[in-house]
Design a protein with these regions (language model features):
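A compositional/biophysical signature of low hydrophobicity enriched in polar/charged and small residues
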Residues: 1-78
Length: 78
């Protein structure tokens, strides 16, 4: 049985680029939800990955976007 790795990625984004970053992130297949937020983080992303290695690739792809300044990843405990 394949167990999906569920995680949340929270990110700070360059000022004024929150919605642009969210639109780019929404296009990623593994992303199930993206919220632009107020507070410490600008964007919250819900991800479902096939493995921890797959999650690592997804997070790396998000971090490489020019709008993204910093991320933190919260991996769900089953």
């Amino acid at each position: 049985m394949v167990e999906i790795v569920k995680a949340y990625v929270v990110a700070t984004v360059k000022r004024g680029k929150e919605h642009e970053a969210a639109q780019k992130i929404r296009k990623m297949e593994e992303v199930t939800e993206v919220l632009v937020t107020y507070g410490l983080y600008d964007v919250v992303v819900r991800v479902e990955a096939k493995s921890l290695g797959h999650l690592d690739k997804i997070v790396t792809d998000i971090r490489q976007m020019v709008e993204i300044q910093q991320t933190s990843t919260l991996v769900g405990a089953q």
